[in-house]
Amino acid sequence: MEEIKLYGVKIDNITRDDAVRCALRATGEACVVFTPNALMLERARKNKELADLLNRASLSLPDGAGVLWAAEKMGTPLLERVAGIDFGAALLERAERLGLRVFLLGGGEGVAERAAEGLRKKHPSLCICGTSWGYFNQSGEENLGVLSHIRSCRPDILFVCMGFPLQERWVMENLQHLTAIRTIACLGGSLDVWAGDIRRAPAWMSRVGLEWLWRMLCQPKRLAQLPKIVSFLWHVPQKEEFRAQNPL
């Protein structure tokens, strides 16, 4: 599979449909899916530990117009944007057809349960085998209890929705306890959308790469992240500079 690197973080050059097929391929070990966006990559640019964490993914999907723009600027264009929530939705459609079991982990109190209710209405044949909230102590007995609950539900697919880098760290630190799961995907705030707590951007805004603007308009506290997005875009090397730094 072709990949590029942004600030030392690998990004797979893949379509959403191919990503779903790849994520569900039976290989004997879990396919771990991360979805780096501009804010995540900006943090990784300043913190090698975060870059190394992102690089442990089996599949790394370009989430956001900023990532596509940066890849284009470097002369390494990507096939398409694969937003985490769109990937998750496509994965759920495939899970419903194949009879796969899904576990939802993350969100505040009741969020995963409401997300499950909403998804069952949309996908009547989908098997959501279990849910758990994301605000638990990620060490000690409470963490072991969550892991035990997940394993007892026997999911084929696990969605972990706690935000970056908490969700990615938790997955990698506990991967040895989740070996029976086929696909583990970190999907940020997807549960809040599926639960109906947060509205997603209109389709036309997503198509033209303005979903980030919608989020900031709906959640003004996100405006504080705007300088980080600008910094990410500013530091992306031009094509000539990138090639000089990465000779064949």
Question: What do the predicted segments below correspond to?
Answer:
Residues 1-86:
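N-terminal nucleotide/polyanion-binding subdomain common to many enzyme families
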Residues 30, 100, 179-182:
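A short helix->loop->beta-strand "cap" motif at the edges of active sites that frequently abuts
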Residues 37-41, 162-167, 190-191:
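Short glycine-rich anion-binding loops that position phosphate/pyrophosphate groups of nucleotides
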Residues 66-72, 200-248:
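A transmembrane-helix-recognition feature enriched in membrane-embedded lipid enzymes
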Residues 72-149, 153-154:
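Conserved beta-alpha
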Residues 116, 168-177:
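Short Gly/Thr/Asp-enriched flexible loops that form oxyanion-binding sites at enzyme active sites
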Residues 133-138, 181-218:
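Short, flexible loop segments at boundaries between secondary-structure elements
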Residues 150-164:
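Proline-aspartate-enriched helix->loop->beta-strand connector
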